[in-house]
């Protein structure tokens, strides 16, 4: 089925191909994952008022983009209990190729100075981390990978005029398994063979994408398939370098780091751009207020 998917050939032709080609054996550990259980459904807040406020006012993302993500079911607001404290959180949802919920990441709204990053950040237990959180623009024929969903929304807002027929994917970290799954998903969609993905377990994702690289010309024929829009830091660069050195054609789209900071992500770029724009507007208003008032005098019409 895998050979038929990638090469678009018949069953007999696939058998002939497998009998002729010398393949390197790989040891794959079989591990069936349990279905993901989502415990927050009954305590979701459909209004998402606090989530909207945090994403627009604190993160600088436009109301229009936040609304799109809410409408597609990728963002909801819920309550989360930590020890004896209940707090509102934003839930970012991950759906697979059958639009079944596979994972959920939580983002705290209120600051908590006892936490390392000041706000709650966690992934729900039992999440299938190989899927990622995806958002489609048009009919996707290429993939753009970000580290977080907030970065994904920021990247979308900054580039929306030039983004067509693309799937934006949040890896929720730096996960090669997400790159493998989403690549196989795109190939399966192109060949109308989504049923193939139903049979693939997570431990087979990397061996399968490596086989495509080694035995087909798929990546040669699709040089613009993969874009990494990860953070501009040591971890992001290391992840990108390793993927490129593995023989995959990868276009690198790091956020600008003109100030030479240790880490810059796409949300940093978005907020800085909006801050600069706001400063320009305030300066223009101040200039207009300080302009001298024109004196007018009456004249007689002859």
What does each model-found stretch correspond to?
Residues 1-58:
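Non-catalytic accessory segments of DNA primases and related replication-initiation nucleases
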Residues 3, 55, 92, 99, ...:
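Terminal peptide-recognition signature
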Residues 5, 152-160:
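Short active-site loop/helix that positions an aromatic residue
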Residues 33-137, 161:
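Basic, glycine-enriched DNA-binding surface that flanks or lies within the catalytic cores of DNA
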Residues 139-143, 224-227:
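Short active-site oxyanion
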Residues 145-148, 173-175:
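Conserved mixed alpha/beta catalytic, RNA-binding, or beta-rich assembly cores of soluble enzyme
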Residues 159-302:
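TOPRIM fold recognition
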């Amino acid at each position: 089925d895998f050979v038929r998917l990638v090469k678009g050939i018949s069953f007999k032709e696939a058998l002939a191909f497998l009998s002729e080609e010398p393949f390197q054996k790989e040891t794959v550990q079989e591990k069936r994952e349990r279905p993901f259980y989502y415990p927050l459904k009954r305590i979701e807040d459909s209004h998402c008022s606090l989530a909207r406020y945090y994403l627009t006012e604190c993160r600088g993302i436009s109301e229009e983009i936040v609304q799109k993500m809410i409408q597609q079911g990728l963002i909801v607001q819920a309550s989360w209990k930590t020890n004896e404290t209940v707090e509102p959180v934003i839930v970012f949802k991950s759906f697979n190729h059958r639009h079944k919920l596979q994972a959920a990441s939580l983002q705290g709204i209120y600051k908590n100075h006892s936490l390392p990053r000041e706000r709650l950040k966690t992934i729900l237990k039992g999440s299938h981390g190989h899927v990622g959180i995806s958002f489609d623009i048009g009919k996707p024929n290429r993939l753009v990978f970000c580290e977080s969903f907030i970065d994904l929304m920021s990247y979308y807002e900054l580039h929306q005029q030039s983004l067509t027929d693309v799937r934006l994917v949040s890896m929720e970290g730096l996960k090669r398994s997400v790159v493998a799954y989403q690549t196989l998903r795109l190939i399966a969609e192109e060949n109308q063979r989504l049923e193939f993905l139903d049979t693939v377990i997570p431990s087979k994702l990397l061996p399968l994408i490596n086989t495509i690289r080694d035995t087909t010309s798929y990546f040669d024929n699709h040089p613009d398939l993969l874009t990494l829009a990860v953070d501009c830091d040591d971890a992001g660069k290391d992840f990108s370098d390793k993927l490129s050195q593995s023989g995959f054609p990868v276009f690198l789209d790091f956020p600008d780091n003109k100030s030479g900071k240790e880490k810059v992500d796409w949300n940093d770029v978005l907020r800085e751009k909006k801050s600069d724009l706001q400063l320009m507007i305030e300066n223009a208003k101040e200039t207009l207020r300080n302009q001298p008032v024109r004196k007018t005098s009456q004249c007689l019409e002859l």
